[in-house]
Amino acid sequence: MNYVLEIKDITKSFFDIKANKNISLKLKEGEIHALLGENGAGKSTLVKIIYGILKPDSGSMFLDGVKYSPLNPDSARKHGIGMVFQHFSLFESLTVLDNLILGQKNNISRADILNKLSQMQHDYDLFLDLNKIVATLSAGEKQKVEIM
């Protein structure tokens, strides 16, 4: 069986401290998982490895059965891997749309961004007024903008 994400024996150390030691997990499509543990247990380290912010010392990852080695967050995003940060990184005085356009790279046209946002809103039930000022949004709405 292919898993959406499979992690095998990921280890990451910082000097002589092992943040992650032989971590393995398998995620099927549609499943929801949570990483739970004390402060310093290595949860953020593992997420950063999956997202391409950190490189593991050893181990391997697979997306849909294909070896996956992100070089950076851009590489991870190209494989459909994203990350939502605990604290918002939005410009409060700008609209939702302006924040989303600022976050785009590679000279994507405004029309392409609007089409992509429309599709995401439909596919993931992330409906928001794109002309609303971010400061007026609830915390949940801001989280939706971060996801988009």
Segments (PLM) and residue ranges:
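Glycine-rich phosphate-binding loops of nucleotide-dependent enzymes
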Residues: 1-148
